[in-house]
Amino acid sequence: MSDKIGLFTGSFDPMTKGHVDLIERASRLFDKLYVGIFYNREKSGFFTIEARERIVKEALQHLDNVEVITSQNELAVTVARRLGAKAFVRGLRNSQDLDYEADMTFFNRELAGELETIFLLSKPAYQHISSSRIRELIAFQQDIADYVPQSVIKELERRTYEKN
């Protein structure tokens, strides 16, 4: 098993082009990168966990060393240890992200001091994109093609088709 294993977690509800860019960049740093879709069955997401898994797998299928996993109601440190990960990978768009991620990093270090956290800065083109903004655009029936991978568009079309 490789020593260079990373874990990039998120809810990906929905995945954005910013997520894809960060994962592509992170995949070059590790022999194996797990992308963990973390969710809580008690909370309802915009997309089902199954839909998110389809979206993420399709968007990342070109990355040979990336594996998509799901985790329900588990701490990220527990999953990281189980997978043999040495580091978390987190994206930062702005200072608010840094504040949140720094707190999470300190907490994770208390629970699992052996795990490092690597921060990647979002490219300027993606700094304004967030999943919550995308959900808002969808709610107002705005075009989101510039902000999300094609797999999100396909999933929205599938959802529309299934409703009709």
UniProtKB/Swiss-Prot annotation:
Pfam family membership, one: CTP_transf_like
UniProt key word DNA-binding: no
Residues at the site labelled Transition state stabilizer: H19
A biological process term (GO) from this entry: coenzyme A biosynthetic process
Matching SUPFAM superfamilies: Nucleotidylyl transferase
Pathway annotation from the record: Cofactor biosynthesis; coenzyme A biosynthesis; CoA from (R)-pantothenate: step 4/5
Binding site for ATP: S11, F12, H19, G91, L92, R93, E101, Y126, Q127, H128, I129, S130, S131, S132
Xref: InterPro entries: Cyt_trans-like, PPAT, Rossmann-like_a/b/a_fold
Annotated compartments: Cytoplasm
Cofactor: Mg(2+)
Binding locations of substrate: S11, K43, A76, R90
Chemical reaction(s) catalysed: (R)-4'-phosphopantetheine + ATP + H(+) = 3'-dephospho-CoA + diphosphate
Biological function: Reversibly transfers an adenylyl group from ATP to 4'-phosphopantetheine, yielding dephospho-CoA (dPCoA) and pyrophosphate.
Subunit structure: Homohexamer.
Protein name, UniProt field: Phosphopantetheine adenylyltransferase
